């Protein structure tokens, strides 16, 4: 062992640093291994472990199978210690798993005998009256015909109902009963139609209310579309019309007369030019 004088502090610090790095690398390697174990299939690992243990009890294992068995045992111990569950595609059928399935067997949904008595009954959305998940089954309370004592003690009013008509109207929808008239011997000459009296006609006219008719009328609106269309003319065209002394919105002169005037003006100019040469 070196004495204190021969100890190099720089070398001691480098050793500590190297040891810390080794511990860090070991931890990272363990984390990566645990992450790989979390993605492994638990059922497949259990199946391989059970097969290798059965094979080991019957015969000796070769080097590869021994190494595989050791790795599986080590991985299973790490998963149990770190509480890593992985995932399961299939499952190993055993007595324990079958017993657990029997104990935790899901119950069938309860269907009441009389669905209409259930408070959850609906003829369209819930015709069986089954309660929703997590809700207890309840039935409707039976309507009792007996009245409460507190309601019986209430005194009835002695007077008539204030909003009731004193003279109720007769019902219009009376049952029709045909009258059976006795046959009478009436001569054709003496038979005359019954004339309606003026009093009955006056009474009928009074009963009929004359409806007042209100008539609404309006005169047609006459619009000058030519004047309105003149607002959309270009400004240069409007100035040209104003220079000619024509109001904006009035129709132009006949096209044929305009063409004739242009021809006459060209002929006059031609004769003026010829007269200058003569």
From Swiss-Prot:
Q: What keywords tag this UniProt record?
A: Nucleus
Q: Where is the composition biased (Basic and acidic residues)?
A: 22-38, 90-103
Q: Does the keyword Nucleus apply?
A: yes
UniProt-annotated location(s): Nucleus, Nucleolus
Does the record's keyword annotation contain Nucleus? yes
A cellular component term, taken from the record's GO annotations: nucleolus
Disordered as annotated region, ranges: 1-43, 81-210, 240-264
What is one GO biological process annotated to this record? mRNA cis splicing, via spliceosome
**InterPro entries assigned:** WW_dom-bd_prot_11
Regions of biased composition (Basic residues) lie at 104-116, 169-183
Supply the name of the protein. Protein saf1
Q: Where is composition skewed (Polar residues) in this entry?
A: 186-202
The main place the protein resides is: nucleus
